[in-house]
């Protein structure tokens, strides 16, 4: 059995995930005690129009010492939800998956095990061993990975894999501008620029069984393209200024 980490903040973004939310929180409550001695679970409701907000509040009320809910009044975007989750986290290690249950909470143990390796990485990112997504999303992902490699030198295998683990200290002082799907890439680009080490580990990926995916919507893709080129042009114009743009990821801990 992998040695447990002392304290872990786990969060997930959720937009119209009423069919997945309760099951994911119950899965986390059952699984995280084997991964961390102390943990918290944060549900980030990104302006959902279904019962996601109400269910998140019910779960927080039922487990007040462990579960918290963060709400966006409107749908601000995937990156904005990740930023809110990172900002709400209180512990030294911070992990997230998506709210669609295409990753299992137990697989965070693969990431914590890698974090404890001799090279002591600052960040561990998962890569999907075999994607369980429609073909169009797989095509988008391959093109996106190639573009990030060419224009930013980002060599991570699976930039947008929603299974990541951070040492909180690695995020201190970082700012990310994108509030959309480009958030993860921008974060990894700025972590590398800050000299932080990133390790990778393969994780299983499971088919979505409830709810609807929004990652391939034209509006989401166009926003990511816009943010991609905005950062690239700013880095060419003034690298140091570009790296300082955006909103801070962390808030002072209470």
For each feature predicted by the language model, list its residue ranges.
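N-proximal low-complexity "stem/linker" segments adjacent to membrane-targeting elements
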Residues: 1-30
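Hydrophobic helical membrane-anchoring modules
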Residues: 1-6, 146, 153, 176-254
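Donor nucleotide-sugar binding loop of glycosyltransferases
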Residues: 17-21, 48, 78
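Acidic donor-diphosphate engagement hotspot in glycosyltransferases and nucleotidyltransferases
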Residues: 24, 52, 82, 106-108, ...
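Conserved donor nucleotide-binding strand/loop of the catalytic core
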Residues: 39, 53-88
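A conserved acidic beta->alpha catalytic loop
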Residues: 45-54, 101
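Acceptor/aglycone-binding surface of glycosyltransferases and processive sugar-polymer synthases
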Residues: 72-88, 93-96, 102-181, 208-224, ...
């Amino acid at each position: 059995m992998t040695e447990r980490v002392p304290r872990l903040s786990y969060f997930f973004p959720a937009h119209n995930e009423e069919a997945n939310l309760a099951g994911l929180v119950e899965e986390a409550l059952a699984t995280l005690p084997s991964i961390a001695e102390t943990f918290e679970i944060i549900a980030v409701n990104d302006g959902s129009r279904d019962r996601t907000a109400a269910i998140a509040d019910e779960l927080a009320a039922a487990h007040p010492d462990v579960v918290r809910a963060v709400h966006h009044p409107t749908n601000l975007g995937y990156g904005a939800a990740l930023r809110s989750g990172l900002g709400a986290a209180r512990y030294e290690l911070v992990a997230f998956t998506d709210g669609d249950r295409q990753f299992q909470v137990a697989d965070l143990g693969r990431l914590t095990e890698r974090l404890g390796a001799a090279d002591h990485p600052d960040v561990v990112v998962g890569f999907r061993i075999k994607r369980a997504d429609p073909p169009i999303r797989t095509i988008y992902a391959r093109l996106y990975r190639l573009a990030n490699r060419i224009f930013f030198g980002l060599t991570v295998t699976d930039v947008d894999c929603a299974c990541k683990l951070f040492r909180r200290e690695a995020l201190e002082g970082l700012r990310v501008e994108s509030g959309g799907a480009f958030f993860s890439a921008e974060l990894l680009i700025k972590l590398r620029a800050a000299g932080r080490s990133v390790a990778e580990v393969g994780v299983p990926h499971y088919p979505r069984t409830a709810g609807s995916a929004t990652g391939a919507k034209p509006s989401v893709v166009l926003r990511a393209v816009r943010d991609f080129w905005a950062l690239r042009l700013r880095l060419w114009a003034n690298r140091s200024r570009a790296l300082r743009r955006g909103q801070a990821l962390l808030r002072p801990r209470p």
